[in-house]
Amino acid sequence: MSNLIPAVIRSKAEASAASLWVIHYFTACGFLELFPWVGSGYDMERFGILAVATPRHADVFIVAGYVTQKAVRRIQRIYDQMPSPKYVMALGSCPMTGGMYWDSYATVKRIDKYIPVDLWVLGCPPKPENIGHGIVMAMNAIKGGFGGH
């Protein structure tokens, strides 16, 4: 009986990693690089990833593109509406440093000051292959027991 509980926990983590539901917030070119994952190029549903319309059903929150001071409130509200465990991916240079809008008074330079970020995907914009690598890394981390937030 004592071996059953770790086996159930492991199998729950594997099932969670194999069926990620995603909500996104995109404002710039990072979104364009995600198109191959939505279409037949990489077909995210083949990996068990499904885009959902409401944060209440989402496991993963993807933020791409520049974030303004006004938009950060929306991002925080989306994050707060997600059930636990929840995971956050930031795509591209804009959520990390403000990107090419770094010198604007209205641009948020680091999104991780407002919501916790679990995975950063580098690039301006990030290539679809890098996004895929990040998704696989996230799946492996969840399988390995990473509990998110």
PLM regions and their residue ranges:
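A charged, well-structured terminal subsegment
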Residues: 121-149
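Cofactor-cradling patches in redox/metallo enzymes
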Residues: 35-37, 46-116, 121-130
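N-terminal, charge-rich interaction modules
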Residues: 1-57
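A short, terminal or domain-edge coil/loop segment
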Residues: 2-7, 79, 141-149
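Functionally constrained cores in energy, signaling, and assembly domains
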Residues: 6, 12, 24-30, 74, ...
